[in-house]
């Protein structure tokens, strides 16, 4: 920034992610400021989070009345399993939902873009398809940004 911008110029980072939930870009900028080699103001512009886009596109609520929703990473889901009946998972390179057959999944990739992909259904029925779509999309584009909501299927519906 110091080498690219003049004293009266403005720079910006357009970052794909959810700065209110998870975004290391803000932490990096804070670290640069902390070092004191350059001074600048940081403004995070609010937008639509991937979680809001996911639930809107699937036409489901994020929460259920009187029930908690847990937001976690794929790594934590793999380590601890689901800790609530509703779990939002981000950053899951390993499809940690596999085997959670008592959950319905609402999965989305590239949410809000022309390349958006949506799949929903019981994990036991759509899990393999999600893995295939995810692998194909990642190979085609070179990257993937996906998010999903797991919702426990009531025992009476099994």
Residue locations for each model-derived region?
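A contiguous loop/helix-start segment that scaffolds small-molecule binding in enzyme catalytic cores
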Residues: 80-158
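Generic secondary-structure signature for well-ordered alpha-helical cores
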Residues: 3-6, 37, 60-63, 102-103, ...
């Amino acid at each position: 920034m110091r080498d690219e911008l003049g004293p009266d110029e403005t720079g910006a980072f357009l970052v794909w992610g959810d700065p209110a939930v998870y975004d290391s870009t803000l932490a990096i900028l804070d670290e640069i400021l902390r070092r004191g080699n350059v001074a600048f103001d940081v403004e995070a512009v609010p937008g639509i989070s991937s979680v809001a886009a996911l639930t809107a596109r699937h036409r489901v609520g994020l929460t259920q009345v009187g029930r908690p929703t847990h937001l976690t990473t794929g790594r934590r889901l793999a380590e601890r399993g689901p800790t609530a009946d509703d779990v939002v998972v981000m950053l899951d390179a390993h499809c940690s939902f596999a085997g959670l057959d008592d959950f319905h999944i609402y999965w989305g990739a590239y949410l809000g873009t022309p390349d958006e992909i949506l799949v929903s259904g019981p994990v036991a029925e759509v899990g393999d398809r999600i893995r295939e779509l995810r692998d194909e999309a990642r190979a085609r584009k070179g990257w993937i940004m996906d998010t999903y909501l797991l919702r426990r299927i009531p025992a009476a519906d099994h």
